[in-house]
A protein has these predicted regions:
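Contiguous segments within soluble domain cores/interaction surfaces
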Residues: 1-120
Length: 120
């Protein structure tokens, strides 16, 4: 399986969730994820030591479907800008490999950091 490239967009302070279907390298079908486990992290840059865990659920293993999500309680601490993430799959044998990687555009809106100075 080759590394699948998928860019995502995340809004600061909102719950992020996206479903992905992993296809075989030759495009002949989906990857059977039965018995696999997955993990994911997002960082400001590949060299940055600070990261946030991304939840990965294998939704339908025989159809290669996974879900990645980040709770709003975590995204509220993100800084706007470009970040990077990847998803590492572990085969039942213990062999680990990067299955998905990409950029994450983190958008901070006008309501992200609200300061109240009296009544509106």
């Amino acid at each position: 399986m080759t590394v699948y490239r998928k860019n995502i967009s995340i809004n600061v302070g909102e719950t992020f969730s996206e479903d992905l279907t992993l296809l075989s390298a030759d495009g002949s079908g989906v990857v059977n994820l039965t018995g696999f486990t997955a993990q994911s992290k997002i960082r400001k840059s590949p060299q940055n030591y600070r990261f946030a865990d991304v939840q990965v659920g294998i939704v339908n293993p025989t159809q290669g479907q996974i879900n990645i999500s980040i709770a709003s309680s975590i995204t509220k601490f993100f800084q706007g800008g470009r970040h990077v993430y990847d998803i590492i799959l572990t085969r039942p044998s213990g062999f680990k490999f990067v299955a998905v990687e990409g950029n994450a555009l983190v958008r901070s809106g006008i309501n992200t950091f609200v300061h109240y100075f009296g009544s509106p």
